[in-house]
Regions:
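Sec/Tat signal peptide C-region and signal peptidase I cleavage site
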Residues: 14-18
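Sec-dependent N-terminal signal peptides
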Residues: 3-13
Length: 92
């Protein structure tokens, strides 16, 4: 019985401890300051692509939400302080 409790304790500790780690894709040593560290020498990151109607239709967007608007060919992020989508291209 003690052995079973020890195994359960070790497994639960591992699960709880894993929740505090960061994730590395393409790297075995993710940067400690990042929750997600993506590394590649020949690929990029593809963020969600929406047209303007889809972007404006996002229900309750989170502060800092990033999308690529295919109508403008530009990145937009949502800012709660202004309750609006802000362009990163200064064209919209």
């Amino acid at each position: 019985m003690k052995y079973l409790l020890l195994i359960i304790h070790v497994l639960l500790f591992g699960i709880v401890n894993a929740q505090n780690d960061n994730v590395g894709i393409g790297t075995v040593t993710p940067d400690a300051s990042a929750i997600l560290d993506v590394s590649s020498t020949d690929k990029g990151v593809l963020v969600p692509r929406l047209n303007t109607i889809q972007r404006m239709g996002v229900a309750n967007p989170s502060d800092g939400l990033l999308v690529f608007d295919t109508d403008y060919g530009c990145f937009f992020f949502y800012q709660n302080a202004s309750s609006s989508w802000l362009s990163l291209c200064n064209q919209a």
